[in-house]
């Protein structure tokens, strides 16, 4: 029997470094040899794990969309019908993503159009489901908010939270806890402001 440790698998290491390099230099600006060197294997050695760069990009972007949706659904279950707790948990979960996976945000912004049609459609489908989960949560807390306004507010909050790559290098953040608390307050304030207009 194999026991899982906290150490990332070789495949996870490859994906993490590919995301970092793609975010820094663009998908077409990075070769398999560079990704391989970043994880200590030859470029051709990557083909034992992935058929090519396209497969890495697809796994990164489809994978994060799947994880965000699964995390959102888990938070719905854990909130046990408390709409304020759910909205707070959704915000916190997305903040964790926005702080910890900044390269994936950059990658999504710049490289989504590089995915094969089927993968791009899958990402968009997962994202729509994630947005709708948030829209329902926002409308539970702010029932006077029209559905279209709630959806617009959710997209605006995603823009706010997903701005973390623009805060400078990872080490330039004022501290994870301070940044997370600020983002949480701003997100809650945005939803409250949207509801105040009704």
Task: Mark where each language-model region is.
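Hydrophobic/aromatic-rich alpha-helical bundle segments in the mid-to-C-terminal region
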Residues: 105-109, 120, 124, 139-187, ...
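Alpha-helical DNA-contacting segments of helix-turn-helix folds
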Residues: 57-64, 108
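Hydrophobic alpha-helical connector segments
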Residues: 59, 74-100, 153
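Short coil/turn segments at alpha/beta junctions that flank glycine-rich nucleotide-binding fingerprints
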Residues: 24-28, 79, 101
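A cross-kingdom feature marking solvent-exposed beta-strand/loop segments within repeated
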Residues: 37-42, 48, 52-54, 78, ...
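Short, structured motif recognition centered on aromatic/hydrophobic residues
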Residues: 13, 19-22, 68-69, 91, ...
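Helix-turn-helix
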Residues: 2, 10-13, 17-55, 59
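Amphipathic, non-transmembrane alpha-helical scaffold segments
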Residues: 61, 65, 87, 120-131
């Amino acid at each position: 029997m194999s026991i899982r440790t906290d150490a990332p698998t070789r495949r996870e290491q490859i994906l993490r470094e590919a995301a970092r390099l793609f975010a820094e230099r663009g998908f077409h600006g990075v070769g398999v040899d560079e990704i391989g060197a970043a994880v200590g294997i030859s470029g051709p050695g990557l083909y034992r794990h992935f058929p090519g760069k396209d497969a890495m990009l697809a796994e990164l972007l489809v994978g994060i969309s799947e994880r965000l949706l699964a995390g959102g659904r888990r938070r719905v279950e854990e909130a046990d019908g408390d709409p304020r707790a759910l909205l707070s948990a959704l915000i916190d979960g997305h903040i964790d993503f926005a702080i910890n996976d900044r390269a994936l945000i950059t990658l999504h912004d710049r490289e989504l159009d590089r995915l094969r049609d089927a993968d791009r459609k899958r990402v968009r489908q997962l994202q729509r489901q994630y947005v709708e989960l948030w829209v329902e949560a926002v409308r539970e807390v702010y029932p006077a908010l029209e559905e279209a306004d709630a959806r617009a507010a959710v997209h605006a909050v995603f823009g706010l939270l997903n701005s973390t790559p623009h805060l400078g290098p990872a080490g330039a953040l004022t501290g994870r806890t301070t940044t997370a608390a600020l983002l949480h307050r701003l997100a809650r304030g945005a939803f409250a402001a949207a509801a105040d207009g009704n």
